[in-house]
Amino acid sequence: MKANLRKLIGTAVLGLAMFSNDIPAWAGQRLLTEVTVGTSSASGTMLGARYSTDKQQYIGCWLYENRSEEFIGCAAQDKTGKSFICYSRDPRWVTVVKAMTDSSYISVEANANGPCTSLTIENHSSHLR
């Protein structure tokens, strides 16, 4: 019985060793930054919001384009329900929003009356799933 068990374990280890090159290794820093909303700013990651334990958080930006105009908007809500929204017609930020992924870290600031004044997107390996 012991011999059969040893043979089975040996075969299993050999099999795992042979196929281990095909198994991806996930390493490195991983941050699931939750959403924070201040009086005139918001920051966080979409993944952090999505995988948070509450059902309140969201963050993201969108782009509206047609033949005559384009503008961006960003919105966020933290775990307490505090929300933030801003918009901009600044054409430089269209490129920034287009570079955004579901793993991007987003930091956005706005004036009190709504226009975005700063938009930072950080695409970094620590923000990947």
Regions found by a protein language model. Name each.
Residues 10-20:
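Bacterial N-terminal signal peptides
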Residues 19-27:
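Sec/Tat signal peptide C-region and signal peptidase I cleavage site
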Residues 28-68:
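Short, surface-exposed binding/anchoring microloops in extracellular/periplasmic proteins
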Residues 68-74:
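Short aromatic-glycine-enriched beta-strand elements
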Residues 82-95:
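Beta-strand/loop nucleic-acid-binding surfaces
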Residues 92-107:
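Short nucleic-acid-contacting surface segments enriched for D/E, G, S/T with interspersed K/R
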Residues 113-129:
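OB-fold/S1-family single-stranded nucleic acid-binding modules
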